[in-house]
């Protein structure tokens, strides 16, 4: 606590203080929207609307109820205030994984006219200090991969790149393409599970899976998997793509409480394009989709097939970690 307190006693950082959900929520939402609105997906826009709804709840009882179990909502962090205006923000979200506690830094944002004054650095330093105080083992954040200024800032503070991921979005009516001859699309079978699980673990590594909505045990065939997604209120459908009796990949559709459902693709680099070019036209023809769908996938992979099918890349993020 003494280390954190010393941050706020510094005259240089007199504008830096902890985020107060009771009075900062609306101003933080405005700042986040200004800085990131153009790159937000439907779920991000829903996130902002919930922040603003919470700002109207003076007691925050409704916000607390919504935030229970939802690790993405900003109930902690730091802001930079000048002249009674919030001009900088950093949200801190706590995650618990087996054997360790992780903090995720989100919504690191500063109004343009206040940039290049060290505000983002001061916010990040304060959050790192608090993470150490809370006995976190690591801190993660995401940054646009082409934002070299931010990447260099975080690198100078001890963050190292861990992954590059692209989020792809598609509206049901925008799906395109015809399936090539020779591909066979079926519901996923129990015999496919071992290979599917291996590919999922490769495409969605454990070190980043904690921040995704992917729970691999929920995709397991049989009663165990059914019980997992039943009690977690998760609805899924899964399809296997084969050619000449060889499994090319497995695609999972997962319903979401947010504005876009999710795809999870289990396929290796050598067959992911063939798998997508077979399964996506099948899904379009059978009209399985009713809502927008989002696919999080390693950057640079399956690009041509996804674009041909009507997907658009929303962003490519560099995932960075600082070990504490």
Predicted regions and their residues:
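Amide-forming acyltransferase catalytic core, primarily the GNAT-like/NAT-type
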Residues: 14, 54-61, 160-258
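Conserved acetyl-CoA-binding loop-helix of GNAT-fold acetyltransferases
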Residues: 110, 116-129, 133, 138, ...
């Amino acid at each position: 606590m003494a280390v954190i307190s010393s941050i706020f006693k510094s005259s240089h950082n007199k504008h830096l203080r902890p985020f107060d959900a009771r009075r900062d929520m609306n101003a933080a939402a405005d700042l986040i929207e200004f800085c990131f609105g153009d790159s937000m997906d439907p779920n991000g826009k829903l996130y902002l609307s919930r922040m603003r709804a919470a700002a109207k709840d003076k007691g925050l009882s409704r916000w607390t109820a919504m935030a229970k179990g939802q690790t993405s909502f900003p109930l902690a962090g730091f802001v930079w205030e000048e002249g009674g205006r919030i001009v900088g923000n950093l949200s801190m979200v706590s995650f618990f994984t087996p054997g360790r506690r992780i903090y995720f830094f989100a919504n690191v944002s500063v109004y343009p006219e206040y940039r290049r004054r060290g505000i983002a650095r001061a916010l990040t330093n304060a959050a790192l200090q608090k993470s150490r105080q809370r006995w976190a083992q690591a801190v993660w954040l995401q940054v646009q991969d082409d934002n070299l200024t931010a990447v260099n800032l975080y690198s100078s503070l001890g963050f190292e790149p861990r992954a590059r991921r692209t989020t792809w979005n598609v509206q049901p009516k925008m799906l395109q393409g015809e399936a090539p001859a020779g591909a066979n699309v079926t519901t996923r079978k129990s015999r496919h599970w071992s290979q599917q699980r291996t590919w999922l673990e490769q495409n969605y590594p454990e070190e980043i899976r904690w921040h995704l909505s992917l729970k691999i045990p929920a995709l397991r065939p049989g009663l165990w998997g059914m019980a997992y997604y039943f009690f977690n209120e998760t609805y899924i459908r899964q399809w296997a793509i084969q050619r000449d009796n060889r499994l090319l990949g497995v695609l999972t559709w997962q319903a979401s409480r947010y504005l876009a459902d999710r795809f999870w693709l289990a396929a290796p680099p050598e067959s992911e394009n063939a798998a997508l070019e077979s399964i996506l036209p099948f899904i379009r023809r059978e009209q399985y989709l009713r809502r927008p769908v989002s696919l999080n996938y390693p950057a640079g992979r399956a690009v041509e097939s996804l674009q041909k099918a009507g997907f658009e890349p929303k962003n490519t993020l560099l995932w960075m970690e600082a070990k504490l």
